[in-house]
Amino acid sequence: MKMDFLPKSVLKISALTFAIAATASCTAMATGTDHQTANATSSTAITLGNAATTSGTNDTVAIGSQANAGLNSATAVGGQANAAGLGSTSIGWQSKATAERAQAFGHLANASGVRSTAVGEAAMAGGNNDTVAVGNKANAGLNSATAVGGEANAAGLGSTSIGWQSKATAERAQAFGHLANASGMRSTAVGEAAMAKGATSVAVGNKSMAGGMNSIAIGNEAKASKDNQVVLGNAGQVQSSTAAQSGTVRIVTIDDNGTLGTMMVDYYQKAK
């Protein structure tokens, strides 16, 4: 009696086809080394890497040594990346996205607020919700804060800090420019090293400073240190304030080029 035997390769393919067909409605894949195996526990999960883990009930992805995708629709890519929030994404070595829909991209990036986004090495988007930190070591600390630039710090509620080492540390403060600093509530600082210290103060220009409440300083190195004071430019130091006048009294002058300046009243009277 003659018997025909199928090649081993055909048998292996047939077995693989049977296994795929048997698990078509429940797809889970886990691969790792012989020493530390990956663990895929959800019905639709992809887990690649030593000690990588996926949890939740569906659509989780963990790729990298000790990567973890903890809840539904979470994605973790990179060594020790941790996407622990529902629908979160964590990409980069030791990156963390620990809140719902949080997004972390970069080495040590950390997005801990709901719908927060952290992009850059050691960028941190905290608060409870809707924070954005973009740049190496950028920090958005409270709700709805936005920090963009290396070491930018938006520490106030709803604050915005854009520029390298810029700071917006009060509620709704706005800082734009390298080393710009808005520390007064609802203050605005625009320009390199511009400083808005008073509440609702405005400083526009490199090294400008608005220190008083409601004060405005416009121009490079312009300084408005009193409440409700307005200073335009640097050389002439044209000033305006609602406070009563004291000390030396000046008048505003303008030349043929349209340049503003100030002159002491006594000097003006003698010049006449």
Predicted regions and their residues:
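Small/polar residue-rich beta-strand/coil "junction" motifs that cap repeat-based extracellular fibers
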Residues: 30-42, 46-55, 59-65, 78, ...
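Surface-exposed, glycine- and small/polar-enriched segments that build interaction surfaces at terminal
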Residues: 65, 71, 84-86, 93, ...
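Gram-negative bacterial Sec-dependent N-terminal signal peptides
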Residues: 1-30
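Short hydrophobic/aromatic beta-strand element in the GNAT-like acyltransferase core
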Residues: 60, 74, 102, 145, ...
